[in-house]
Amino acid sequence: MSCFSRTFLAASISAALFAPQIQAEASVDDNRAQLPNGEQCLVNQPEPTNPGQQPINVEADKLEAINGQKATYSGNVVVVQGKKRIAADNVTLHQQENVVVAEGNVQFSDGEIKTHSTKATNHLNTDEMTLENTRYQFLCEPGRGEAVYVSKTGKAVYEIEDGSITSCPDGDNAWRMRASSIDVDQNEEIATFYNPRLEVQNVPVFYLPYLTVPIGDTRKTGFLYPTASYGSRNGYSFEVPIYWNLAPQYDLETTFNYMQKRGTQLNSVFRYLTDFGAGQIKSEYLADDQLHTELGDRWAFQYEHNGIFQQAWKFEIDYSKVSDINYFSDLDSGVGNREDGQLIQEGRATYRSDNWDSALLVRDFQLLTKDTTSTNLPYRLMPQLSYNYYAPETMKYLDLDLVSHVSRFETDARGKPSATRVHIEPGLKIPFSNTWGNWTTEARVLGTYYQQDLDKTTDAKLEESVTRVIPEIRSVAGIVLERDTVLLDDYTQTLEPKIQYLYVPEKYQDNIGLYDSTLLQTDYYGLFRSRKYSGVDRIESANQVSYGASTRFFDSNYKERLNIAFGQIFYLDSKLNPSNKNPDSTSDKTSYSAWAVEMDFNFADYLFYHGGIQYDIDSQAVQLGNSTLEYRVASGYIQANYRYVAKDYIRNTVGDSITNIDDITRDGISQAGILAGYQLSRKWSASGQYYYDLTTDEALEWLANLTYTSDCWYVGFTYSNQLKSWNGNFVTDPYATPIYENNFSFNIGIIGFGTSIGAGSSMTGVDSAGNSLGYGRPFFLNN
């Protein structure tokens, strides 16, 4: 063997050029550096100033040279220059042209691609290369293929004639794209196909005259790889997405979604970035739905914006609208934020300073129910102007603040008034705190003025003009005690007792409508809030002491493993206890609220539990409760959950805003569910969920997913069965029957070249198939 290392090709073979034929030395210098094997991605390595001047190393069994013209190496030939490596049976070096021609079992790599060809020609000065009858594989991106002719015309730029490309590994021809010509630019991460056809297991499935696709993660205009699916709701579906890189600050993705039973839907997402923030516009349009011809064209639209301008202004917009109320139940859609059967339509502009902020808010909605005049419809906010002032540490241990807003409420609800509300709320706070405890005393004055339009109002208690002033005094204190546990080694336990006194005088408020006030969640932490409602239309009177404690356990790494909290309210005025407001209650009046208990548990990071309960000792009844238990390992999880709300509790807490409780629920809420997901093997995974209503003895929903994921494609199967409505009133009619919607679907798609697993494949979560209930982790330990 012989090894040559010079600064220029001519110098590397100069000794051989003086003789017409020479036998290369058979000995090898074992101390020389190991030559690179060409199997690594080297595209990000810095390039030399003059690549053609790099040293060349040649290994061969035999060398023949013609003076001043060429040198021919044969027998186990390896030529290395910088990142380029050629191995072949024969290699000819043309000195004058600085060209290498390799023939016979040619293997080439340059840190970006490796190939196996019958012949290769490399122009060392220009970095140009041609390959014939080639199998190739990219080293910096997933991808391989075959070609009759491959030409490299620049750094990471390739032209492929009569070739194919796939992201599948060697030996797997599940799919490939064939074309008469393919241009691949790894710098731009884009591939251009001429006369392409997609083959699945060597069978052509579609043809296009021209196609560009991205082959990386950067933004490039072109087709994204399509997905195919079948569902009992829409029949066969085929989606072809196209990405448009319009400018550095905005782009567009359009998707043609063909549905066998409905027609072709055009979906688009336009994204932008400006000095005022970032946003996106989503649209979906289905011309003349063939499954529901009476509905005609069906569409959906959403505009979202969120941004900060000049560090003081913040702009937020979320506006959604659909063509009809059944749009989301008939079509899979990613448009809109839905709450309680409504599409949110709101915009907010906020200005913030060091000590104050002001905001203008407009909120509307689109109802997704048939009843557009019900008395339970929410109010539109048209608009609300707020101003808040903060003066922390005005003096030592003294904070001042002011909350104020002017709001206009409008509604289409039958018998409900519109109104203008002005609210001013100054506050004073005296905080004390140290490492082991805190004590805060707060005083506020809530002044509110209402001008109510009563023309269409049926509630005789309401008054046109109302002025309400209510003081509020609150004092809350807590301490943190800590010790090393006795029974558990290396564990630390805390005990955190807490107490609060709250006084709000009783004030007649039945002459005021409910505009934006909703009941806040009631749990252990809610015992120590000053407000029962989120808005100011109802200021719940109070003369009460809340007390409770929590204890936490931390392991040696100070990771929280167990948290138990319990507490109760003692009403100094028993008539203020909500439990005493039910006229149908037969129990004696009590001065105590139900006990609220919360518990979170994490055992060895694989068994998790969260539970909460409110138990009324006087009535010996559970008012509400929830419980979640989850077992999780690296390959999957199983979770069981249950929630319960007593009907009397619903009546006592929200009876003012919902008057037809007896028509909505028979025995309150009692629902159980189980969810599971498991990686069956490296390629197979499954997930599912089941929810059951114990008050109606009917299933709410069940869903099952099964997915196969290979290295370059996936297929997902989904079956769902959802309770959509009832034939009759299930509360009052014993013969009412449930109406279910069944749907089976499968999705198939490509992985690689910048694509990922699609929605609905069952790999993006058990809630990816449009089901209303999904997986969540309601565990609140500090981990």
Curated annotation (Swiss-Prot):
The keyword Signal applies. Its main location: membrane. It holds the Pfam family LptD. Keywords: Cell outer membrane, Membrane, Signal. Residues 1-24 form the signal peptide. It is found in: Cell outer membrane. GO terms for biological process: Gram-negative-bacterium-type cell outer membrane assembly; lipopolysaccharide transport. One of its GO terms (cellular component) is cell outer membrane. InterPro entries: LipoPS_assembly_LptD, LptD, LptD_C, OstA-like_N. Together with LptE, is involved in the assembly of lipopolysaccharide (LPS) at the surface of the outer membrane. Component of the lipopolysaccharide transport and assembly complex. Interacts with LptE and LptA. Belongs to the LptD family. This is LPS-assembly protein LptD. It comes from Vibrio cholerae serotype O1 (strain ATCC 39315 / El Tor Inaba N16961).
